[in-house]
C-alpha cells in the first residue's frame, strides 16, 4: 500500500502564515516598525565582529565568574552551560547586528597536563571571524572560543 493510497482522493492540505510586522519582515529595536533590509551582504564597518573587543569581553566574564572557582566534576556541566549563555548574551549586547554567535566553552581539571584543541569552519573570510581566551587557576582551566558568522 502506498502513502498516496492511504489518503482519501478529496483530501486537501491548507497552510496559513501570518506576520506581525509590515511586509512579513521582523521588526528590530533600531527600525521601530520599518522592515529590515534583507539584501545586505556585508556588515556596516562599526558592526563587524572585532576579535580584540570580543576577547576582552570574554576575559572579563571569565575573570568574574571563575576567580574563586574550584573544579568539581558534578558542577562543571552546569557551569559550562552558564558561562556559554552568559558570554553569548554579553556579545549580543555589543551590537553585532545580523551576526550568529557561537560560543564553545571547555572546562577541565588543572593537573599540569597538556590539552590540544582545534576548530574548523567554512565561512566568509570578509565578514566572519573568531577569537578565544584561556583562563587558568590552581584548580581548573577554561578555554572559550567565540565565533561570529554574518547572517546574510
From Swiss-Prot:
One of its GO terms (biological process) is regulation of intraciliary retrograde transport. Keywords: Cytoplasm. InterPro entries: Tctex-1-like (IPR005334), Tctex-1-like_sf (IPR038586). One of its GO terms (molecular function) is dynein intermediate chain binding. It comes from the Eukaryota. GO terms for cellular component: cilium; cytoplasm; cytoplasmic dynein complex; dynein axonemal particle. The keyword Cytoplasm applies. The keyword Cytoplasm applies. Coiled coil: none annotated. It is found in: Dynein axonemal particle. Light chain of the cytoplasmic dynein complex 2, a multisubunit complex composed at least of eleven different proteins. The cytoplasmic dynein 2 complex consists of two catalytic heavy chains (HCs) and a number of non-catalytic subunits presented by intermediate chains (ICs), light intermediate chains (LICs) and light chains (LCs). Belongs to the dynein light chain Tctex-type family. Acts as one of several non-catalytic accessory components of the cytoplasmic dynein 2 complex (dynein-2 complex), a motor protein complex that drives the movement of cargos along microtubules within cilia and flagella in concert with the intraflagellar transport (IFT) system. Required for proper retrograde ciliary transport. This is Dynein light chain Tctex-type protein 2B. It comes from Bos taurus (Bovine).
